[in-house]
Amino acid sequence: MYMARMLSEMSTVKRPDGCYIVDQEHYQIVSGYAGELLPSNSNVCNCGISVALQKLENKSHNGMDCIIYTSSFPDCSHCLEKILNLKISKIWHWNSPTTTKELKILEMLEASSIQCEKYTPTRTISINFNN
């Protein structure tokens, strides 16, 4: 999730987000951030998920059973369609779905056997310089 958050910092668009896709062994396959690629079609979103999925399609990897780490929940039909077609197995997202549209997308993903979980940090590092 750290990489997805750092990728979102590279974003130059109004709604920054980053996406990091790994295989089942957690090896990086592709990454992307919003605004990285210019869309060839104005009807296609240019979010980090879309950019990473576009890169995944251009590789020889089929995307099956991959895991997506994203700084924002996928909220567009274009990304949803790509996620379903590539048979992604799990999505870790930083922000929880809050809108009605996002909740419907969450239901569709879970109905398609795609696990969706909000990422919660499990470890914190604190350094005390006063000793």
From Swiss-Prot:
MF terms from GO for this chain are: catalytic activity
Q: Where is the CMP/dCMP-type deaminase domain?
A: 1-116
Top-level lineage group: Eukaryota
The protein's matches in SUPFAM superfamilies, at most eight in alphabetical order, are given as: Cytidine deaminase-like (SSF53927)
**Pfam families linked to this entry:** dCMP_cyt_deam_1
The protein depicted here goes by the name: Uncharacterized protein F10E9.7
Record the organism. Answer: Caenorhabditis elegans
